[in-house]
Every structure is written in C-alpha cells, then in structure tokens.
Amino acid sequence: MSIDLNWETVTGGPDGQELADQIRDFIHTKFQSVPLPRFIKSVTVHDFQFGVIPPELELKDITDPLPDFYEDHVDSDVASDDSEGEEDAVDNNLAPPSQGERHQRTDDSEALGGDVRNLGHLPPHLMFGSPGGPGGPGMGSLRNGDMGSPFMRVSTPGIPGGTSNLHYFHSHLGGGLSGTQTPLAAVAGAQHLSTANWLEGHGHSSSVPNLTHFGNPGGAGTSPRRQPERNHSRNPSQGSISVADLNPNSLAPPSSSTLGVPSLKEKHSTTPAPGSATALSGSNEQQQQQQPQDNDDGHPRWREQRIDDMQAVFRIRYAGDVKLLLTADILLDYPMPSFVGIPVRLSITGLTFDGVGVLAKIRKRVHFCFLSPEDAAAAVGGDGEEGLSSPGEGPSQAQGQGQGQGQGQGQGQTPGAGQQKQQKKQAGWVGSGNTKLGGLLQEIRVESEIGQRESGRQSLKNVGKVERFVLEQVRRIFEEEFVYPSFWTFLV
C-alpha cells in the first residue's frame, strides 16, 4: 500500500528549517569525532537542505514492535514514565518517599509535638538534658535521616548567662566518669576544653546528670528521667549546632575538622517538597536506591508489552535532490610537511536510497530505524528481489540485471551510458540467485570546487581522496546511527 507524503509540510516552514539545522549540527558533530587522514586538517559542515523531491513510501506489514524497543534505558533522558504516579517524580527529578519514611516522620512529629511547645520554659541545661528535649531521645539521638527533617527549623532558645558555667557544671558533677563531655558541652565550653580531649571520650558511652533540683515551670518537683547509656554517633546533636551558631565568638558553623564529624549542609529556611527527600536522609536513601540499580547493570530493564503497541514496516525509495555542503582543509606538504591548508568545498547534490524502515509506536514513544540488508530481505519476504530495483524500474528488470552480473555480462543489454549508470548503482550488490541489498545508500553525487582546473582535472591530486573519504564517512554515519540495532526514539 503506497502512502502519499506531503513533503512540503514536513520540510517547510520554521519547523522544517529547525529540523534541517539539527541534522546539519548532528553531522558536523560526528565529523569532529572521526579520525582524519594525514592530508586533511579539518572538516566543517555548513548547510543541509531536504530538497523538493519526496521519498516513495510503501506499507509492507504491521507487526508487533521489535524486542529492543522495549528496553528501558534508566540513564537516558527518556526514562520510563509508564505509570501515572511516576511521571511527576521523573519531571521533578526526585524520588518519592517510601511508606516507612513517611511513617517515621509522623512518629517524630508526634514525639516532638508536646515537648517543643514547652522548651522555652525550661532552663537551657535542663532543656538539652531532658528526655524530650534536643538532648534526649526525641532530638539528641537523631538518626541521619532526621537531621534534615523540617523540624530542624525549630529555633533553639539562646543560652543566657554564657556557656562556660554549663561546662563547669558538667565537668564537676560528672567527676571522672568518661563520656560526660557531651557534644553540647564540648562546643559550649570549647574555651575550657580542648577538642582533642573531647574527641578521646567521644566514642564512649554517655549519661545525663540527674538534675533533681530543677523543677517544672509549674513548681512540681518531678525529676526528669535518666537517660540510658548509649554510644555517641559521629553526628552532633541539634543543640550543639545551634549553640555554635549562637556563639558570638564564632561567625561560622563548626567545621568537620573541629568537631570530628562529617560536614553538614547549611540549614535553609525553605520547606522541602512533600515528595522530596531531605538533605541528609536523601543521601542515604539514594545509596540504597542506587545499590539495586548498580547490581542490575548487567541485566537491562524491560517495559511491559501492551496490546495497543504496534509497528509498521515500510519500503522507502528515494532518488532526490537532498543537499549537504561542507568544506575540508587539504594540507600541502610542499615545501615542508603540512605547510599550508587549502579549503575544498564539497557539495552532496543528491543520493539514491532503497531500503526498509521500521516505525514503532509504544505508548508515548515512537521508535524509528532502517533494517540491515539481511533483516530487510526477511521483512519484505517475497519482495526481496523487488527490493533490488532502483526507483523507476520494475522487479523483472532488476532480476535480469542481477542474473546478468552473476554470469559476467548481461545478455540482451547494450553496453552504454545507461548500463554503466545502472552498474554504478549496483556496485555493492551481490549478483546471485540469493541476491540481497549490499548498502542502503546506493549512490551519492558529489561536486567539488578548488583552485583552477587544468585540462578538465583538478590541480591537486588529493581532491579525489577527500571525496572518497567524505563519502565513506557519510555512509558510515548513516549505517551506525540509523540501521538496526541502532534506532531513534521520539517522545509524542
């Protein structure tokens, strides 16, 4: 079934010009990565035009998409967005929190709900040592995941009267017990206690002094509960960071070299997005999420096949006036190697193409590629012999030419310019009973301009080599980028 293609609509207007510019830039980029021969200095692509002659399209078959089209490239720009809830996460480049994380944040908020409201009525040392205060289980034993939670933005009241007395109280009451210098006391009393001494006891268990002589704001003499002994983590409590921020002697938060802890990001006043991970918990979660992906590097992910996925197989024939303008600098070796470079202007004024293309529609993606000669012969089935004909000639003529080439000289054909032209088109074809396509690009017409001509020949001998090199690279770029298993994916 033939398909009429409105070539002017596809290639005309601003969209067509933008597409032509993108193709020009793509070819230019590919030429920059090609190793050039010694006699060529550089290759530059200047212009690309589609021309006015459209290709001929013929629908051959409608089948299921190729298996490779279902491969999900996680590291690509078009990662899987099949599920509805996954699209928002892909757009924001954020991973949604797990159910356990949301439950954990809810428990933390409930645990802090009653204590945070009464922090302002307690003395500073009791506030940091109470079970519900920042030094207790609610905040003092924060895990890595809680350090970046929105509750970090709760302002910690200042410590009136200075912090040296607090260190004096802890050091005398604790006596010779190891680990009584908590991170809060170490930061607050840094002028009396060196960092090295605090680090020596930082890894030991700590206990909070029994502050029985301090009461509640209401006057009830209930004593706070005693903290169970536990090992300190490498992360300082929130209170220690807040005290350092409020210390008038320091203008910057404590560094990792001073506290012996990993450097923390600056606290911001902005609230994290509901579906985003926090600063420090996100790093741990990303490591956990990336670990399964790293383990699956050798096993690609595959999207689920659906009944509405389809693939169309086309026979594409083209003998048009597509134009590609580029320049190549030829190096002259006289009077010394690479003495000077002379630009050579090469113009591709048209090409002849005959091949089989595949267009697959899978949900929001359209995949396109050309088939190799072997795959094309299998896809068109009984039309494999017809696939040898160039635009404008019938299957019988192409079959006769193939048999004639297999015998050395076609019978019944008069040698002449027309036959030489056909033989030039068939240069890469194997002439046997099992004839198949030898290359998708059958013919590329090139015009070169350089210097002056002498007796109809170029004045430089390397012009022919430059032409062959450019044509080989154009053919190689086409086959590597557009022929299956390589394919192009478009989002629709």
UniProtKB/Swiss-Prot annotation:
It is found in: Mitochondrion outer membrane; Endoplasmic reticulum membrane. The lineage of its organism: Eukaryota, Fungi, Dikarya, Ascomycota, Pezizomycotina. Residues 130-139, 401-415 have a biased composition (Gly residues). The keyword Transport applies. Residues 1-492 form the SMP-LTD domain. It is a peripheral membrane protein. Component of the ERMES/MDM complex, which serves as a molecular tether to connect the endoplasmic reticulum (ER) and mitochondria. Components of this complex are involved in the control of mitochondrial shape and protein biogenesis, and function in nonvesicular lipid trafficking between the ER and mitochondria. MDM12 is required for the interaction of the ER-resident membrane protein MMM1 and the outer mitochondrial membrane-resident beta-barrel protein MDM10. GO terms for molecular function: lipid binding. Keywords: Endoplasmic reticulum, Lipid transport, Lipid-binding, Membrane, Mitochondrion, Mitochondrion outer membrane, Transport. InterPro entries: Mdm12 (IPR027532), SMP_LBD (IPR031468). The SMP-LTD domain is a barrel-like domain that can bind various types of glycerophospholipids in its interior and mediate their transfer between two adjacent bilayers. This is Mitochondrial distribution and morphology protein 12.
